[in-house]
Swiss-Prot record:
Compartment(s) of residence: Cytoplasm
Chain segments carrying region Disordered: 527-546
Cited PROSITE patterns: TCP1_1, TCP1_2
Disulphide bond pairs: none
Protein name as annotated: Probable T-complex protein 1 subunit theta
Gene source species: Schizosaccharomyces pombe (strain 972 / ATCC 24843) (Fission yeast)
Length: 546
């Protein structure tokens, strides 16, 4: 009789509370469903008519936006497979600024197609291999369907052509004004070698009130606060930056002072006053006319700064202080004292101006190319201004992609339909089991024009059938979805000036596909029991990003 040894199962291997999911049904299908649920949330925000979401995070901060990267970042996703999509979206947003929602939606659609093929009898490995083959064909097709290119990033008209579509997906109706604003800001700080362009050189200041169309670009830096003292303007001044409070150091020991008469009381604080006066006079004699500090300013120090007509402003943010140092060319000092000549910076004009009902301080450079430009945004509510800022950040980030690759493809879902048709054709010519995965990969691109038409209130089936008919005709590769539905639901993206940046599209497709391949190659999910006890406190919402 054969000896039968019982197999050790999961509960005998691990501590109590572990969850083990294995097999195609439990591991792969459940992961697919989780990611599809996430993609359904952001899918309604795709395109110019994408809907806004109100998200309240664990710190009770409210976000009103249709920016997919912001939405899923603040949703606090805990599913391990869905977190892969969150990471991919954040990478796309940080590197290129555009097509973040495409990553989520396309990943969800690919996994929906994969789930159907698994139920048909294909294995996840066969599907993954087919998707890999389809990805390489997609990159080849994208090279072939390039529609245009940016001749030079130093031209405002050429920049607007690339930025406009990206901004219209976030702020439809305001894209012309905002793209013009972003293009002006970029050209203000663009170095002679465009490849050295730094997105941090463009900052946004939000001032509530008035309308968006009163927004403007200011050369230099704008701080939404007034100087601390009575001096509000300085020209061609040397700047000293202190990363400490402007105060004299106090001893840690406590002491009791015995005063015998009134004269001793009058003389008691004279030593402190003389010390501060000598400090400020030394700073003045060194040529400094503007002082910037990140800490508080002592009343006595402020008195002597006003007496010597030195402008002093407080910048509490470490990030802004570091950026200001880069603008004026100064080195931040850790204690109050006279800066060395190489530690001082210089600025052409520091002045206080009124924007709306608020007074702001401007550090302005006179020359044509400045180190920093500030976009001053106006709007009615804080959430609206925050959403405008996200749209501007995406528009600025697009320039990073244009510097690396200046080619454009047709937008409005036209390039997606072209990819769909060509990949289905490739799949039909591919022998063997992988042809199913390649064809399904191609059909997944249909989700973009379908979703754009759905969100615009059109009949998606009717629009898709018209797009198929148009793209099978000669010179029909530029036909996309018309969200304003002036004709039959389709338009010529070339005539409408709707273009996507090729590099952003390539990156989004690659990130989505790699995420799908990772999920399909998972055969087991092992989750431990969450640790007990109180949850760790969240980050302080008033801290800087640094």
């Amino acid at each position: 009789m054969a000896l039968r040894v019982p197999k050790a199962s999961g509960p005998q291997l691990f501590r109590e509370g572990y969850r083990i999911m294995q097999g195609v049904e439990d591991a792969v299908i459940r992961n697919c469903n989780a990611i599809r649920e996430l993609s359904e949330i952001t899918r309604t925000s795709l395109g110019p008519n994408g809907k806004n979401k109100i998200v309240v995070n664990h710190l009770q901060q409210t976000f009103l936006t249709n920016d997919a990267a912001t939405i899923i970042r603040e949703l606090e996703v805990i599913h391990p497979a869905a977190k892969l999509v969150v990471d991919a979206t954040q990478q796309q947003e940080n590197e290129l600024g555009d097509a973040a929602n495409f990553v989520v939606v396309f990943t969800g659609e690919l996994l929906a197609k994969a789930e159907n093929m698994i139920r048909m009898g294909l294995t996840p490995l066969e599907i993954a291999k087919g998707y890999e083959m389809a990805l390489s064909h997609t990159m080849e097709v994208l090279e072939e369907i390039c529609a245009d290119k940016i001749e030079t990033v130093e031209s405002e008209k050429e920049l607007i052509k690339a930025i406009r579509t990206c901004i219209s997906s976030k702020q439809y109706g305001n894209e012309d004004f905002l793209s013009d604003l972003v293009a002006k800001a970029i050209l203000t700080v663009l170095p002679k070698d465009p490849s050295k362009f730094n997105v941090d050189n463009i900052r946004v200041v939000k001032i509530m009130g008035s309308s968006l169309y009163n927004s403007q670009v200011v050369k230099g830096m704008v701080f939404p606060r007034e100087p601390e003292g009575t001096v509000t303007r300085s020209k061609e001044a040397k700047v000293a930056v202190f990363s400490c409070p402007l105060d004299i150091s106090q001893t840690e020991t406590k002491g009791t002072v015995l005063l015998h008469n009134a004269q001793e009381m009058l003389d008691f604080s004279k030593g402190e006053e003389n010390l501060i006066e000598s400090h400020i006079k030394e700073i003045y004699d060194a040529g400094v006319r503007v002082v910037v500090t990140s800490g508080n300013v002592n009343d006595l120090v402020l008195h002597y700064l006003n007496r010597f007509e030195i402008l002093v402003i407080r910048v509490p943010s470490k990030f802004e202080l570091r950026r200001l140092c880069r603008v004026v060319g100064a080195t931040p000092l850790a204690r109050m004292g006279v800066p060395m000549p190489e530690e001082m910076g210089s600025v052409d004009v520091v002045e206080t101006i009124e924007i709306g009902g608020d007074r702001v301080t401007v550090f302005r450079q006179v020359e044509d190319i400045t180190r920093t430009a500030t976009i001053v945004l106006r709007g009615a509510t804080k959430t609206y201004l925050d959403d405008l800022e996200r749209a501007i950040d995406d528009g600025v980030n697009i320039v990073k992609a244009l510097v690396k690759d200046n080619r454009l493809i047709f937008g409005a879902g036209a390039s997606d339909m072209q990819l769909c048709i060509r990949l289905i054709s490739v799949g039909e010519k591919t022998p063997g089991i992988y042809q199913h995965a390649i064809k399904q990969y191609g059909e997944a691109f249909e989700v973009v024009p379908r979703t754009i038409s759905e969100n615009a209130g059109l009949d998606p089936t009717d629009v898709i059938s018209k797009l198929y008919a148009a793209h099978h005709k000669e010179n029909g590769e530029s036909i996309g979805v018309d969200v304003e539905c002036e004709n039959d639901g389709t338009l010529d993206a070339k005539e409408a000036g709707i273009f996507d940046v090729l590099l952003a599209k390539k990156s989004a497709i690659r990130l989505a596909t790699e995420t799908v391949l990772t999920v399909l190659n998972v055969d087991q999910v092992v989750m431990s029991k969450p640790a007990g006890g109180p949850k760790p406190p969240g980050p302080n919402p008033h801290w800087d990003d640094d």
